[in-house]
Amino acid sequence: MVDYHSAGQPYPYGGNGPGPNGDYMAQEDDWDRDLLLDPAWEKQQRKTFTAWCNSHLRKAGTQIENIDEDFRDGLKLMLLLEVISGERLPKPERGKMRVHKINNVNKALDFIASKGVNVVSIGAEEIVDGNAKMTLGMIWTIILRFAIQDISVEETSAKEGLLLWCQRKTAPYKNVNVQNFHISWKDGLAFNALIHRHRPELIEYDKLRKDDPVTNLNNAFEVAEKYLDIPKMLDAEDIVNTARPDEKAIMTYVSSFYHAFSGAQKAETAANRICKVLAVNQENEHLMEDYEKLASDLLEWIRRTIPWLEDRSPQKTIQEMQQKLEDFRDYRRVHKPPKVQEKCQLEINFNTLQTKLRLSNRPAFMPSEGRMVSDINTGWQHLEQAEKGYEEWLLNEIRRLEPLDHLAEKFRQKASIHEAWTEGKEAMLKQKDYETATLSDIKALIRKHEAFESDLAAHQDRVEQIAAIAQELNELDYYDSPSVNARCQKICDQWDVLGSLTHSRREALEKTEKQLETIDELHLEYAKRAAPFNNWMESAMEDLQDMFIVHTIEEIEGLIAAHDQFKATLPDADREREAILGIQREAQRIADLHSIKLSGNNPYTSVTPQVINSKWERVQQLVPTRDRALQDEQSRQQCNERLRRQFAGQANIVGPWMQTKMEEIGRISIEMHGTLEDQLQHLKHYEQSIVDYKPNLELLEHEHQLVEEALIFDNKHTNYTMEHIRVGWEQLLTTIARTINEVENQILTRDAKGISQEQMQEFRASFNHFDKDHCGALGPEEFKACLISLGYDVENDRQGDAEFNRIMSLVDPNGSGSVTFQAFIDFMSRETTDTDTADQVIASFKVLAGDKNYITAEELRRELPPEQAEYCIARMAPYRGPDAAPGALDYKSFSTALYGESDL
């Protein structure tokens, strides 16, 4: 018997649970009768045990309300035991006295003890007195014996069997893991899983949520009560709000599910047994149907195949007989093997079916009439009998037809070759291509005709062979002799026609050859004289149409003289043209007399009379055109010469004037007469005189435009071009403007740096001394020599090179490789005058800042104009020193950045 105390938990009603000897309420030595239950557990047990008792008492038409009061007289206790056991108990005593009640309870306890349950620890007096703990313990003992003890799953029973049953049923469900009868059931999913496993239509399991246990529990309780007739024995709130639900209450309720579904399992077992029997029967019926269909199909195939094998009617051609042989071999190779397999499978299926029927106590299978295995074997024997000799008969027929078919094929091949050779021959012999042929064509046609005559004679043997084969096929009674005879007759008739046409064509070719030889001599004469004359006309046309390009009067006068000489040769050329055309007319007369259609092309030349006449007419048209073109060009060259002289006269005045002005400007920029203001005034007057000269340049531009419009590209009367004049004018304006700007910058530098007039003249003298080419700029070596002359230590050593590179970076920051006079003055002024420095600006900011190392925005706005103050605030970096105040600005880095000593 199963030990319900295997988990080592104390038995709450004073016993050790079922022991090895099957006792359910073994007495404990240390049992305290006054020990009270956990209030939550007691509440759960009262509700569960009451509902369980009522689920059985209602069968007797009664129920209890208070479990520890309603069982005190023992009457309903005895009734409960009769209902759940199905046995009659001794007649109860109906008295109201205490002794009557004790006797009734003892009768109930004696009945429980008779079922192998130890009830020594349960006293009838305590039940009669309404001891709740003892009453609940007694009911739990009854539940164990009559509701749980009989549960058996595999080799486990009672509690372990019920737990294993729950685990098996809920295993497929997510979030369900039944390990006990307390906390495994708190979320309600296990109850719902049990119901869904047996009655899936009652529960929508996928919609349940593990985090909503009250809803899950109520759903399971309501469905069980409504559809499974299992009363609600538990409260969802009690289970959820209890850390560890009462195990006995849960077991009692779960056992009701077990008993409710056990009936369904029995019905399912019975249904499975019926289905198994029906499945065997259906399988047998399916095998019977398969046998009937397979046998019917096989017999039908045999019935259709035997007449085909028995047909021995000969065919006309070897191809047809070979096809029959191929069909037979295809039958033996493709069609028959599956049928052999079907016949074998049919016998196997029949034997298997009979064995299954015999083993399942079914009557033997009797196929339909004519579909017995013996009927199939008989039909198969007839089939194999029909096969015998069929292949041998086919091979004999093929051997008989093979020579005859070979002879017929030989006839067809020779006839086809001959017909292919004769194709187009009649049309070729009938054509009159010689009427339009040249002499060389006629000779080629005669040689070609001779070759054809040789080929015709060679084909005579083939025609005779074709006729002989046709005669042999007639004698062997070939089935297609009529078509052979018709084809042979057609070949013979065509052969006679070809012979007649060959003779007629030879005569026509020889006659035409003689006539064309005469015409050919005339064509040769024509070609010898037409070719040189045609070349002369083409050369003349090229010369008359030649695009002459002349630039002088002398050149056009030479062209006019050459043209006059050409015109003097035209009468002799016209007489030669008439003689050449007369030769062509004579050749055409002979062709017309003998009905010869000339192709129109002289084989010796491509120059036709039409070409000669066309080119001669073209020469006649080009001569006056050339006359007019030469006269027009002569007039144009005379006009161009006048334009050249006009432009040269003006250019020879403007060019030297600009050159003189350029030299004077260079001299003014170098010489140092008077003050800078005097030089500036003199240069501006000089600039105005240059601007006043511009109308002369505009007049020259007008003359140049006329020259360009006349497409005059050279002028021997002057060395000046308009491009030279324009460049010189632009250079003149640029030079005077640059020189004025240099003087203005020198004045600005002098005033800003406090340079005296004597110092400025000294700087100019030094600069001019080393500006050897008078270009207005010093190269690096010239500048170094100048610095050395002024006392700077820039000799060719390491220290001197470093100093020179520093100075060059100041005067030539762009790295152009030259030093202008303005850059030279700036450098010298910085070296000789007092200038602002970064240190001076830092000192000024320190005064504004009150001798602090930083300055604030308020101090800048207070001491500087608004625009300069905001400029400084926007560009000054925050001051990071240890004495920095909020909003402190770094005026030192700002000052050094102003002079390029750091980044702004």
Curated annotation (Swiss-Prot):
Pfam (any one): Spectrin
For the region Disordered, what residue ranges are annotated? 1-27
User: Which Gene Ontology MF annotations are present?
Assistant: actin filament binding; calcium ion binding; transcription coactivator activity
SMART domains per record: CH, EFh, efhand_Ca_insen, SPEC
- Actin-binding: annotated segments: 1-259
The alphabetized UniProt keywords are: Actin-binding, Calcium, Cell junction, Cytoplasm, Metal-binding, Nucleus, Protein transport, Repeat, Transport
Pinpoint the Calponin-homology (CH) domain residues: 43-147, 156-262
Identify the main location.
nucleus
GO biological process, alphabetically ordered: actin cytoskeleton organization; muscle cell development; peroxisome proliferator activated receptor signaling pathway; positive regulation of transcription by RNA polymerase II; protein transport; retinoic acid receptor signaling pathway
- Please state every residue range assigned to the domain named EF-hand: 758-793, 799-834
| Annotated compartments | Nucleus; Cytoplasm; Cell junction; Cytoplasm, Perinuclear region
Q: Where are the Spectrin repeats?
A: 286-396, 406-511, 521-632, 642-745
Gene3D superfamilies associated with the record: 1.20.58.60, Calponin-like domain (1.10.418.10), EF-hand (1.10.238.10)
Transmembrane domains' residue ranges = none
Residue runs in coiled coils: none
Q: Can you tell which superkingdom this protein's organism belongs to? A: Eukaryota
Which GO cellular component term is one of those annotated? cell junction
* Annotated Ca(2+) 1 binding sites: D771, D773, E782
Q: Which residues participate in Ca(2+) 2 binding?
A: D812, N814, S816, S818
Q: What does this protein do?
A: F-actin cross-linking protein which is thought to anchor actin to a variety of intracellular structures. This is a bundling protein. Probably involved in vesicular trafficking via its association with the CART complex. Involved in tight junction assembly in epithelial cells. May also function as a transcriptional coactivator, stimulating transcription mediated by nuclear hormone receptors.
Q: How does it assemble?
A: Homodimer; antiparallel. Component of the CART complex. May interact with nuclear receptors.
**PANTHER family hit by this protein:** SPECTRIN/FILAMIN RELATED CYTOSKELETAL PROTEIN (PTHR11915)
Q: What is known of its domains?
A: Contains one Leu-Xaa-Xaa-Leu-Leu (LXXLL) motif that may mediate interaction with nuclear receptors.
The record's comment on protein family reads: Belongs to the alpha-actinin family.
**Protein name according to UniProt:** Alpha-actinin-4
Taxonomic source organism: Gallus gallus
Q: What is the lineage of its organism?
A: Eukaryota, Metazoa, Chordata, Craniata, Vertebrata
Q: Which gene encodes it?
A: ACTN4
